[in-house]
């Protein structure tokens, strides 16, 4: 079935432009409610949790979803600002039938999106998303007045998730003596992550923790680590932690200001859990994962598999293999022994716990782990440009082939249309003697030259 609305991570776009409009989101809530009621098959009303990040449009879409779900006879519990992984966790612990996230993750405030979790706290199966899309074709109708859904606001949601995050490290472990700069991207973790780290004993200073509805991800967060690098050096911190707007990604910075990405974090957690005989299988990365990660895991005799880009595909491969650990270079890390989805706070805590156990700095822990030089260029497309047609352009394919020939067996090229933004991502990876930045730029320039304007 061809999808009209759902991408790799729910439905996302620019606020006020179809489909990210109040009327569509109201009907989306209604369609979700209809599907849930049918699937649960209970006489009692289905129950859904709704959480959001800090975008100003979140108020509008929260109300729209609440109205649509109520019209379908579904009860709603409102969490307010809450990280995406917190919504997944609370959906499970409240025994809700589904969780809904209002967020566009690392995108700017002008964008927003809707994504769903099942009762188990994992992304919805494709079949369920297709059912929701089918319901959207039907005229909206309201259940009988005595069957309408109710809504309530959960007052202690943040505190519950804070305690969960702390529970993912050993009870007696303390972060006392660690000086941490925390960047919350002016997003959904601003009132949660500082409390988690401080209650575990860390000395925490903040950037990106003053959301105003318009500044989410603006020059801060995991996709803009320069601000964190500068703050770590200026404040003499042991490390920095950068989360994204909805808290499902994390990037770290060591005491010297060097960025520690998702591949580094996966390596550290995998090595630590293997050493303690806790790994439970292998590691799932993605097509974007650095060759150095695969080589380092192989040297440790840890199986490694690549999934398509997107945390839902990482989760699918983890489930298929019966493994627990996976993630993306961007900082989506799934620690399946404690969480059902990517969780930036929890992933950071796993690394902090390793630092405490080993009595070592972040830089020391990564000593000897070498990644292949990798360049990533994002080409933003014009509205008139078709992604697939552009990737199939004969001249673009010729340029890609020439770069691949130049790299030979010592590198690779990956072109990937974003599932959440109007972008084509150009990745070139190669041995140190290649100028991967120049090679990636060559391909990106050719793509830009063939866009429809």
Curated annotation (Swiss-Prot):
The note on cofactor binding and number reads: Binds 1 Mg(2+) ion per subunit.
This protein's record includes keyword Membrane:
no
Q: Do you know which CDD domains this protein is assigned to?
A: GlmM (cd05802)
User: In which domain of life is the source organism classified?
Assistant: Bacteria
Q: Name one GO molecular function term.
A: magnesium ion binding
For binding Mg(2+), which residues are annotated in this chain's numbering? 105, 244, 246, 248
User: What UniProt keywords apply to this chain's record, in alphabetical order?
Assistant: Isomerase, Magnesium, Metal-binding, Phosphoprotein
Q: How is it modified after translation?
A: Activated by phosphorylation.
Q: Which residues cross the membrane?
A: none
One GO term (biological process):
UDP-N-acetylglucosamine biosynthetic process
- Where does the record place the catalytic residues? 105 (phosphoserine intermediate)
Q: Which PANTHER family match?
A: PHOSPHOGLUCOMUTASE (ALPHA-D-GLUCOSE-1,6-BISPHOSPHATE-DEPENDENT), PHOSPHOHEXOSE MUTASE
Q: What does this protein do?
A: Catalyzes the conversion of glucosamine-6-phosphate to glucosamine-1-phosphate.
Know the name of this protein? Phosphoglucosamine mutase
Q: Supply the source organism for this entry.
A: Chromohalobacter salexigens (strain ATCC BAA-138 / DSM 3043 / CIP 106854 / NCIMB 13768 / 1H11)
Point out the gene that encodes the protein. glmM
